[in-house]
A protein has these predicted regions:
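Structural motif
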Residues: 2-6
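ATP-dependent carboxylate-amine ligase
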Residues: 9-12, 19-46, 50-184
């Protein structure tokens, strides 16, 4: 099998490529065709999607919203060249946030700075008394000052505008509409 250079980052994408490779081999596809296909794959929308640059900082968006996905995405992001890794995270649903609150703190350890937007409610209403401020508090309990809660996208954008520097990596993450921050 020829050596393959993937265009998508992350160990999880290596496993995906290996599964695709195995399926292709079972189907009798030539190794060179497999290599060409895997090397041409640039990923999918909202999965470590390069959105552009802002004053020399790279903006990337990812749909990750479960702690395991978040940790995998941040692990991939750490291998991406950057000075500081900013994670702009929007928790998805009140029930998920409450149920997985301790895991979010651990999953977000891979970022240098975590900026939190309000929870994306989707189909829910807030009956659990949980907010993104609770996620920030959980992170800051172990890593003081690492996480900051903002009530609006405009506040997050203002913070990024003031503090992000050339060479930084800004990763918007969540299943809701947090990608809009990276587009502004």
């Amino acid at each position: 099998m020829p050596r393959i250079q993937l265009a998508v980052p992350g160990e999880h994408n290596v496993y995906n490529a290996l599964a695709a490779l195995a399926a292709c081999r079972l189907l009798g596809i030539a190794p060179e065709q497999i290599r060409d296909g895997l090397e041409a794959y640039r990923g999918t929308e909202r999965r470590f999607e390069h959105k552009g640059e802002y004053h020399g900082a790279v903006i990337v968006d990812d749909y990750a919203h479960h702690p395991q996905e978040i940790a995998a995405t941040l692990k991939a992001a750490q291998k991406y060249p950057h000075q500081k890794l900013w994670c702009v995270f929007q928790p998805h649903t009140y029930t998920r946030t409450k149920a997985l609150l301790p895991e979010f703190g651990t999953a977000l350890e891979g970022a240098d700075v975590v900026l939190l937007a309000d929870i994306y409610a989707a189909r829910e209403t807030d009956t659990l008394g949980i907010s993104s401020r609770d996620v920030a508090d959980a992170i800051n309990a172990d890593q003081p000052g690492k996480a900051r809660y903002f009530g609006s996208f405009a506040e997050i954008e203002a913070c990024l505008s003031r503090e992000v520097r050339a060479g930084d990596l800004v990763l918007t993450m969540g299943a809701g509409d947090i990608y809009r921050v990276g587009e502004e």
